[in-house]
Amino acid sequence: AHCITADALNLPLADASMDAVLFQHSFLNMPDSAAVLNECRRVLRPDGKLVMHEVVRGPHANAMRYPVPWASDAQHSHLESADQLRQQLEQAGFHIDHFIDWSDDALAWRQRQRAKETQQSRQAVLSPQLVFGERFITMGKNLVSNLGEGTIRVVEVGATVG
């Protein structure tokens, strides 16, 4: 097994050559997610799996607080609703095996992480704050608020080429 990182709109892979495609907190950065799903469908073998752990737009998306880890403002955020994601998956030729909302668990985890971040006297060696710098304190706070207020949701999706 091997891992490839590439442009999701133009994967350097032959048709029907992969057993699985994995996305984790990626779609929120992709302005043309329908085209990305079509590209995934192209490279997956028959019965290939698409696995996603993604942030989607919640019922109160208009109240989104920025910055967040994926976008400094609304112009750079490409969140879609869970219903839009389902529809795009089906239109791209996927059968949805499961679609689970993990938002409550994600919120609880993020709250625990925030508590650790504020208690630590020194920054952990590997952390989002290492990447984002001091901005991550605000991003993390906004992420917790957005999850708690229903502006975003976190979902797990398993789908099969069908």
Give residue ranges: language-model regions:
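A short SAM/SAH-binding and catalytic strip from SAM-dependent methyltransferases
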Residues: 19-32
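A short glycine-rich, Lys/Arg-flanked "PGG" loop and its adjoining helix->strand segment in the class I
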Residues: 34-49
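Short alpha-helix
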Residues: 77-99
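Conserved Class I S-adenosyl-L-methionine
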Residues: 100-162
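Adenosine-cofactor binding site in Rossmann-like domains, unifying the SAM/SAH pocket
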Residues: 5-7
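A short acidic, Gly/Pro-enriched loop at the edge of an enzyme's catalytic core
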Residues: 9-21
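Short, glycine-/aromatic-enriched active-site segment of Class I SAM-dependent methyltransferases
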Residues: 55-76
